[in-house]
């Protein structure tokens, strides 16, 4: 089967009695690593959705993730996943080829683009052409019905930051040697990352920083919540470091991203559920690569804050956040930490330091009302 550990357990099915007229399938991720498993799970969901599956639920269980699918008994779920995988890979690789730069070498022609599975979200330039070629081979093997079950594909830091010697111990995550996984899980992980994992690539002449945000559900999600998460992901997120220094900080970069990409309707849907975000930054300075930051914080709170303000005054919310971010870095950090840790005094202090900036009274009122919900 596509995912190791596929099983239907009697005790779990008992809680799904009302669906017994349907075929109930429980998919469990392999258990490689919390982040890698999350991307694999999102990949499974994307493949199923592309094949018209609507009755599915997605939830965490320990460091793994489960997808429950309820479909008529005559539906072959395995075939649907493979067809969805083929469809997703075709779309991803078509985008890569359409916007990519073609480079002739002695061996062949390399294609490098700003999509996430090429140069967009990979710090190591070996992967810029290598990953797309691997996904191309997997796509052709799906067509032939010859998916390899051998664990031969190296997982890059982008998909699993703990799988590499560049993970410092100070972040509380033990680094290790890169692991290898089979074709199906490799493709599923990249599909999940491509459609559900926001990232921001910032660079200048000597440095590149790639902030990656793995969105973790802390409770069960239905199809509507899952699809709303896709609004978080823009396909290309590249910025010049020289213009916006705040992008170096992963929390401030996320605040900017959410402010400028997330719709009010999607924010409203997502804030009804509990999520956390595991953020990590891949850094390349003067050809030295490393993971410089790794952390987890409450995404739901940040999104709820933005939804509350945007619902009141959409335009001025964007202007207000931009003014905060483009000011003093210490002020910006004080502001976002005040939101994440329910500290109204910190937010007020940051706002007071915005000298010569006119702030809409509606924004101030909305901030006070939002904090009032916690007291």
UniProtKB/Swiss-Prot annotation:
Pfam families: Cas_Csa4
Superkingdom to which the source organism belongs: Archaea
CDD domains membership: Cas8a2_I-A
Any one of the GO BP annotations: defense response to virus
Keywords: Antiviral defense
Record-linked InterPro entries: CRISPR-assoc_prot_MJ0385 (IPR010184)
Purpose: CRISPR (clustered regularly interspaced short palindromic repeat) is an adaptive immune system that provides protection against mobile genetic elements (viruses, transposable elements and conjugative plasmids). CRISPR clusters contain spacers, sequences complementary to antecedent mobile elements, and target invading nucleic acids. CRISPR clusters are transcribed and processed into CRISPR RNA (crRNA).
Family recorded in the similarity comment: Belongs to the CRISPR-associated protein Cas8a2/Csa4 family. Subtype I-A/Apern subfamily.
Protein name: CRISPR-associated protein Cas8a2/Csa4
């Amino acid at each position: 089967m596509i995912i190791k550990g596929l099983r239907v357990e009697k005790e779990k099915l008992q809680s799904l009695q009302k669906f017994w007229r349907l075929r109930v399938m429980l998919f469990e991720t392999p258990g490689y690593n919390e982040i890698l498993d999350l991307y694999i799970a999102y990949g499974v969901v994307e493949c199923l959705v592309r094949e018209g599956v609507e009755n599915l639920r997605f939830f965490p269980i320990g460091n793994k993730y489960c997808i429950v699918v309820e479909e008529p008994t005559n539906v072959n779920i395995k075939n649907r996943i493979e067809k969805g995988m083929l469809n997703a890979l075709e779309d991803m690789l078509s985008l890569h080829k359409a916007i990519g730069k073609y480079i002739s070498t002695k061996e062949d022609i390399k294609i490098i683009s700003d999509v996430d599975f090429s140069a967009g979200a990979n710090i190591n330039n070996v992967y810029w052409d290598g990953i797309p070629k691997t996904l191309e081979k997997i796509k052709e093997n799906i067509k032939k019905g010859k998916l390899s079950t051998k664990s031969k594909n190296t997982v890059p830091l982008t998909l699993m930051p703990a799988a590499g010697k560049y993970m410092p111990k100070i972040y509380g995550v033990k680094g290790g040697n890169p692991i290898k996984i089979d074709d199906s899980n490799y493709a599923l992980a990249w599909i999940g990352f491509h459609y559900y994992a926001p990232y921001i690539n910032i660079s200048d002449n000597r440095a590149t920083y790639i902030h990656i945000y793995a969105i973790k559900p802390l409770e069960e999600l239905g199809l509507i919540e899952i699809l709303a998460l896709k609004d978080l992901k823009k396909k290309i997120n590249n910025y010049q470091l020289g213009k916006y220094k705040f992008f170096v900080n992963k929390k401030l970069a996320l605040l900017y991203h959410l402010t400028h990409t997330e719709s009010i309707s999607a924010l409203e849907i997502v804030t009804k559920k509990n999520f956390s975000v595991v953020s990590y930054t891949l850094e390349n300075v003067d050809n030295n690569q490393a993971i410089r930051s790794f952390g987890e914080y409450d995404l739901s709170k940040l999104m709820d804050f933005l939804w509350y303000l945007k619902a009141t005054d959409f335009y001025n919310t964007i202007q207000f956040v931009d003014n905060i971010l483009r000011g003093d870095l210490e002020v910006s950090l004080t502001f976002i930490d005040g939101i994440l840790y329910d500290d109204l005094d910190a937010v007020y202090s940051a706002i007071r330091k915005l000298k010569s900036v006119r702030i809409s009274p509606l924004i101030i009122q909305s901030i006070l009302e939002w904090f009032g919900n916690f007291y």
